[in-house]
């Protein structure tokens, strides 16, 4: 068993790098959704969908390029644990991408955030907004990345506001 077999989500606010943009990433088998926050870490917005390449690391290079372009201080990758709170194949895949990205962008921290049901929630939001299933494919990964990052930002803000909690943000 490797460390990734026991990988749990990180807690927002721990080791917080302070003010600056964050990037949220939703790792899918075909596409990777990317979102970013404003420098104050209040609002997550979609950035782009990166095509996933199993045979190369081109998608990881593009993610690293976005971290540099957006001057991100922290990256949050969705960890899709099963509803039984286990690390399944999708979670191992996300961990592999996160670790490859972390090697490229050090010392910028890469965190793992619980993302159970994020894609389901994103699909529901798009459906309620009147986006047809066919049109959702192009947007779903970015919307899921926004959900992952917004949840992280909200939890981070609460953790940093709590007495004796969080980092130095």
Curated annotation (Swiss-Prot):
Keyword tags: Cytoplasm, Hydrolase, Nuclease, Ribosome biogenesis
Segments of this protein annotated with the region Disordered: 1-24
Top-level taxon of origin: Bacteria
Gene Ontology biological process: rRNA 5'-end processing
Keyword Hydrolase: yes
GO terms assigned for molecular function: nuclease activity
Feature: compositional bias, Basic and acidic residues: 1-19
Entry-linked InterPro entries: RNaseH-like_sf, YqgF, YqgF/RNaseH-like_dom, YqgF/RNaseH-like_dom_sf
Record GO cellular component, one term: cytosol
First-tier enzyme category under EC: hydrolase
Its EC number(s): 3.1.-.-
Places the protein is found: Cytoplasm
Purpose: Could be a nuclease involved in processing of the 5'-end of pre-16S rRNA.
Family matches, as HAMAP family: Nuclease_YqgF
Family, similarity comment: Belongs to the YqgF nuclease family.
NCBIfam families documented for this protein: RNAse_H_YqgF
Protein name: Putative pre-16S rRNA nuclease
Species of origin: Mycobacterium sp. (strain KMS)
């Amino acid at each position: 068993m490797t460390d990734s077999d026991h990988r749990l989500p990180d807690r927002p606010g721990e080791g917080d790098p302070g003010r600056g943009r964050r990037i949220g990433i939703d790792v899918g088998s075909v596409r990777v959704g990317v979102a970013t926050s404003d420098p104050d870490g209040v609002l997550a917005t979609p950035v782009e969908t990166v095509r996933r390449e199993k045979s190369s690391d081109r998608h990881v290079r593009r993610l690293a390029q976005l971290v540099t372009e957006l001057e991100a201080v922290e990256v949050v990758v969705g960890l899709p644990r099963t509803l039984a709170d286990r690390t399944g194949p999708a979670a191992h895949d996300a961990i592999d991408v996160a670790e490859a990205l972390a090697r490229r962008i050090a010392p910028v921290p890469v965190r793992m955030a619980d993302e159970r049901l994020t894609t389901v929630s994103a699909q529901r939001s798009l459906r309620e907004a009147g986006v047809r299933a066919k049109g959702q494919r192009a947007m779903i990964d970015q919307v899921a990345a926004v959900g992952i990052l917004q949840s992280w930002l909200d939890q981070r803000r609460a953790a940093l506001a709590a007495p004796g909690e969080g980092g130095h943000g």
